[in-house]
Regions:
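Conserved active-site-proximal phosphate/metal-binding subdomains
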Residues: 2-132
Length: 132
């Protein structure tokens, strides 16, 4: 229905990157996949904490800290991006993935773990059904 809504609103296409993160062809790590299958997928927001530029992602510890009252404003891109990647890499060595940029759109909770070709077929079938 999301694709049909975008097209009905005048768009010529719909961006659906998040829909493909759970596909086996994706390079997403296990933590990213687990979060997309959890309640976390229902809480996304635009933030510039990770990169210094606004982008939508799942809320984690870094987002909560970086957006809290009194937190410093993120550095401009690419400094914020480099710093966040280094912080995440260090935390990940201890098994902590609370500092990873896990980008996700507003429909993240609708993600499905299907091979990419199958997902495209399903999305087209659903679009055709909605459009009648």
């Amino acid at each position: 229905q999301g694709i049909a809504s975008a097209l009905a609103a005048g768009a010529v296409a719909a961006q659906m990157g998040t829909a493909f993160i759970l596909c086996p062809e994706s390079a997403a790590n296990a933590s990213y996949r687990e979060n997309l299958l959890s309640v976390r997928a229902g809480e996304t927001r635009l933030t510039s904490v990770f990169s210094g530029r606004p982008a939508r992602g799942m809320v984690n510890r870094l987002v909560r800290y970086g957006e809290a009252d009194g937190s410093p404003v993120p550095a401009d891109y690419p400094l914020a991006d480099d710093a966040a990647k280094q912080l995440n890499a260090l935390a990940a060595t201890s098994g902590c993935h609370e500092f990873a940029a896990q980008w996700a759109g507003q429909g993240a909770a609708l993600s499905r773990a299907l091979p990419a070709a199958d997902l495209v077929d399903v999305l087209m079938t659903e679009l055709n059904h909605v459009q009648g």
